[in-house]
Amino acid sequence: MHVLTTITKITITMENKNNFDLYNEEIFNIEEEKEIENQMRDISLSGFELTSTEKTLLNTSTLVPSPSTSNLEDTGNSTVPNSTVVTVVPPNKDRKIERPNQFGDLKTTNHLTKMNSNIMQSIAEIFNAEILKFAKRVNAEYPTVPVEGMLAIWCKQQDMPLSTFEILEGKEEVYNNIDNEDDEPTQVVKKAPPKKKAKKVVKKPVEVRDDEEDVEQENGVENGADEMTSDAEDDRRSSDEEVEHAKPVKKAAAKKKSPAAKKEKEPSKECQHMYVKGKNAGTKCTTTVKGEGNYCSKHKSKAV
């Protein structure tokens, strides 16, 4: 009878067993969360060195303390001494297990999901801090690249609000339309240089003076005489070379001037015509008079 009473006290009904399983599941979830948190605290981000501030962000995610056994109450109905009989009373099925909202405004009922979200949020803050450092480093090397512009582009690409970075707070109007700007540079149309109008060159008719014609004729006669004398000399030299041990070549005969060249040149006379109009007004015609008279052939008719 004593043994039967002990078994009866320890036995749990099916209804209470369901509540007990729920309690065990809660303890299991807390232990699993603790393992995940320890793993996340030991994580090393490739390419990033965690600072003391960043480590503090990761250490802020505290776990819910496991419920103590002091909540387990003894009904006091057992007649068996406490040293031999253990009475297990599961939590009341009507009591709701309250989970404190220690993870901000994350709207979820899964405690594990809340914890993971908090850790990922801390990691995101670390990434953003590294992005800010990188932007400042680029700006130090290239002052023409603004830090705010780089951060604004980063927020747009990652679909994040500009308020993610404190440096961009209150500047939404400036950077909200950053995607609406034209990516392609404006094409600069080069204007063709104006064409220069070619000036028409009017050639003035050159007046051939009578004295120039006489000089050309005299030069032509002299050139013809020179050619004749040079041909005669060549014939003589060729005949002298045929005879061996011939006498020295005699000096060439003096050049004979043509009869036209022997003629004495008559004294030249200039035209006596005076210009009255035009650019030569007040000057006298310089054309040489050919033949008799005091006027050239051009002004002879006007002098009559």
From Swiss-Prot:
<feature type="compositionally biased region" description="Basic and acidic residues">
    <location>
        <begin position="261"/>
        <end position="272"/>
    </location>
</feature>
<feature type="compositionally biased region" description="Polar residues">
    <location>
        <begin position="61"/>
        <end position="76"/>
    </location>
</feature>
<feature type="region of interest" description="Disordered">
    <location>
        <begin position="61"/>
        <end position="82"/>
    </location>
</feature>
<feature type="compositionally biased region" description="Basic residues">
    <location>
        <begin position="248"/>
        <end position="260"/>
    </location>
</feature>
<feature type="compositionally biased region" description="Acidic residues">
    <location>
        <begin position="209"/>
        <end position="233"/>
    </location>
</feature>
<protein>
    <recommendedName>
        <fullName>Uncharacterized protein 411L</fullName>
    </recommendedName>
</protein>
<feature type="compositionally biased region" description="Basic and acidic residues">
    <location>
        <begin position="234"/>
        <end position="247"/>
    </location>
</feature>
<feature type="region of interest" description="Disordered">
    <location>
        <begin position="178"/>
        <end position="275"/>
    </location>
</feature>
<feature type="compositionally biased region" description="Basic residues">
    <location>
        <begin position="192"/>
        <end position="203"/>
    </location>
</feature>
